Amino acid sequence: MLRICLFLVAFCHVVVSDVVQLQKMYGRIASPDFPNVYPNSKERTWNITMPQGYTIRIYFTHFNLELSYQCEYDYVKMQSGGEVLATLCGHESTDTEEAPGDKTFHSLDNNLAVTFRSDYSNEKGFTGFEAFYSAEDIDECQQRIDNEPICDHYCHNYLGGFYCSCHIGYVLHKNKRTCTA
């Protein structure tokens, strides 16, 4: 029994994780202990949520993570709309790994999950990341339904939404998109 316990202590590395909920229209996120060296065996997820009618724009001002093949050790992963937008690691992109550089990322909807994960061996003093996010208004008037404009006649976009209107002599239907004479 003692051998099993020693084996578990020696070879099992527990990753400590936590989740942060963010609902402000803009903000800053950073790896734990930034700008100092980030800790080993840490996972933190920031769930960023905006009101309907907005997406989320995020860019990195500092990025210095351990480089590993396909970012399997330390990484920042961004997910939105059920899809992985990017998995980032290292300092510069290679043929199999991506670092953010000057790239700006956009969520697919009003939610963005950003997960930072470190393994058990940050031996070279990597300092992690700093990123800034903000809400971006969706221009619903540019969207299409079945390849048709969202409004029959006029579409009016405003922060967080839109409305349709009709030419003089036409009436807007209950669906608030279709116009008839």
Language model: regions and residue ranges:
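Domain-level representation of secreted and single-pass membrane ectodomains enriched
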Residues: L2-A181
